[in-house]
Amino acid sequence: MEGISHRTLLVNGVNIHVAEKGEGPVVLLLHGFPELWFSWRHQIVSLAARGYRAVAPDLRGFGDSDAPPSSSVYTAFHVVGDLVALIQSLGPDQVFVVGHDWGAYMAWWLCILRPDMVKALVNLSVAYAPRNPGRRPVDACKTIFGDDHYICRFQEHGAIEAEIAQIGTTLFMKKFLTYRKPAALIIPKDKGLEVSLETPVTLPSWLSEEDINYFASKFEKSGFTGGLNYYRCLNLNWELTAPWTEVQVDVPVKFIIGDLDLTYHTPGIQDYIHKGGFKSAVPFLEDVVVMEGVGHFINQERPHEVSDLIYDFIHKF
C-alpha cells in the first residue's frame, strides 16, 4: 500500500511485525482491539509525506506478530517491554508516540515507565486513568455496568472466542468496527454478539469491503485470543502497578476523542477530562480535542483530520 514496507523484528523475546514508511523523526503508532497496524494506514502515508518515519507495529498477540499462549504475558510491563526494545532497534533515543484504544493505554504506561524515550504523545479515545487503589478495574466495570459489560464478558477464556467463531470473523469485524452507540457495550450471555452488535446495512464511507477483508484475513490466522488477553490482564495490571499509584504522566500530551465514542460516555469521564482531573494527572496536557459526530475508531473514520491534528502537535518539538 503506497510504498509501505514490512519487516519482522525480534524484540523482548517476541517477533513483532512492523509497517513503516518515510524518513525523519520516528512516529510510533500503536493500535487497539480488534485492530492491526492497518488501522494507521492513512496516518502512515500522511506522516511520511510530511517528513516523518511512521512506524506501526502489530502489538504482541495481533496480526503477524507473535502471540504467546499464556494470558498473563499481556500486561503493561510485557507490552511496554516490547515497545522499549522496538524503539531501541529503530535507532533514535526518543520518538513521538500516537496511541488509540489499547495502544493508548500502553502509550500512557510507556510514558510513565520510560518518559526519557518519548518526545511527545498524541493519544486517542482512552484517557489516562490513575490507579484506584480501592477497586480492581474489572470489579469496577461489574459494579457500574453489570456482568454483561463487554470488558467483563471478555474475561471468559474461550467463551467470547466461541461467540466470534459462531458469527464468523468477517461479520464480527463489520459489527465491531462500525459500533457507534455513545453508550456502554453490553453483550448479554443469552443473546450474544449476533444480537448485541448491529450489522450495518452498508459499510460507512471510511471502511471498505477490502479493509474488512484485510482485517478478517489476519484475524482468521491469528485468532482473537491474543487481543482479548489484554482485557484479561486488566486486574493483573492493577496488582502489578501498585508502586505507581498517584503517578503523573510527565510528557507533552495532546488528547483526541469523538463525541460518539463509547469511552467518552463512561460515567464521570467528561467531568474528569474537562474539569481539571485529567490535567492534574497529566500536567503537560496541552490540548483536548473532541471531534463531533465521530465514533470510537476515530483514526479510521476521520483519517485526514486526525493526521492533521497529530502533525500540528508533533511538529512543534
Give the ranges of each region predicted by the language model.
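Flexible "cap/lid" subdomain of the alpha/beta-hydrolase fold that forms the substrate-access gate
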Residues: 2-5, 15-16, 26, 62-98, ...
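Conserved SAM-binding loop
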Residues: 29, 56-57, 99, 123, ...
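Basic/polar N-terminal segments that are highly enriched at the extreme N-terminus
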Residues: 1-7, 316-317
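Conserved HGGG/HGGXW glycine-rich cap/lid loop of the alpha/beta-hydrolase fold
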Residues: 14-67
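Signature tryptophan residues that serve as conserved aromatic anchors
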Residues: 33, 37-40, 102, 108, ...
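Catalytic active-site module of serine/aspartate enzymes centered on a nucleophile-bearing elbow/loop
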Residues: 283-317
